[in-house]
């Protein structure tokens, strides 16, 4: 089974367990933890080979889950949707070093994505480094990452 498939199975299982938390299902922090962990694991899988790659997945998942949980605790559905759409637009079309912003007029939360260096990884995928900054309830948090274009164009 490919590493990505394993990550997706873990994310799906975690999601189903989170949904069993009672009325209302998964809360914002749980969602942030899950998505951050899955994203961190995917990011970590881009580095190293063999055991080194597994270490990268573990470290990425842990760091992503912690940061995602902290950010998710204060983000609502609209914040997440705006951040996701902005991230996609920034990584696909924005020049390196430019800030692409989002702002939720209902709660005042905002953030921006700054795409940086574009490169090809060891498997030939086009990738891009980025910084994501969010300000939730007046508190700023930053995350750094890499996103790679998948063979299906996503």
Swiss-Prot record:
One Pfam family named in its UniProt record: 17kDa_Anti_2
Residue ranges crossing the lipid bilayer per the database entry: none
Lipidation (N-palmitoyl cysteine): 20
Segment forming the signal sequence: 1-19
Residues carrying lipid (S-diacylglycerol cysteine): 20
UniProt keyword list: Cell outer membrane, Lipoprotein, Membrane, Palmitate, Signal
GO CC annotation terms, alphabetical: cell outer membrane
Membrane topology designation: Lipid-anchor
Subcellular location(s) of the protein: Cell outer membrane
First-listed, main subcellular location of the protein, grouped into a coarse class: membrane
InterPro entries referenced in this protein's UniProt entry, alphabetically: Anti_2, Gly_zipper_2TM_dom, Surface_antigen_Rickettsia
Protein family membership: Belongs to the rickettsiale 17 kDa surface antigen family.
Protein name: 17 kDa surface antigen
Organism: Rickettsia parkeri
């Amino acid at each position: 089974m490919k590493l990505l498939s394993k990550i997706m199975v873990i994310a799906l299982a975690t999601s189903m367990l989170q949904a069993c938390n009672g009325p209302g299902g998964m809360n914002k922090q749980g969602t942030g933890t899950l998505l951050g962990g899955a994203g961190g694991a995917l990011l970590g899988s881009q580095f190293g080979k063999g055991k080194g790659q597994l270490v990268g997945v573990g470290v990425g998942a842990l760091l992503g889950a912690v940061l995602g949980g902290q950010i998710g605790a204060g983000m609502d559905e609209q914040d997440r949707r705006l951040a996701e759409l902005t991230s996609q637009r920034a990584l696909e079309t924005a020049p390196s070093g430019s800030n692409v912003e989002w702002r939720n007029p209902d709660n005042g939360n905002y953030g921006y994505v700054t795409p940086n260096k574009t490169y090809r990884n060891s498997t030939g995928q086009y990738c891009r480094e980025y910084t994501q900054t969010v300000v939730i309830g007046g508190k700023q948090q930053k995350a750094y990452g890499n996103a790679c274009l998948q063979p299906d164009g996503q």
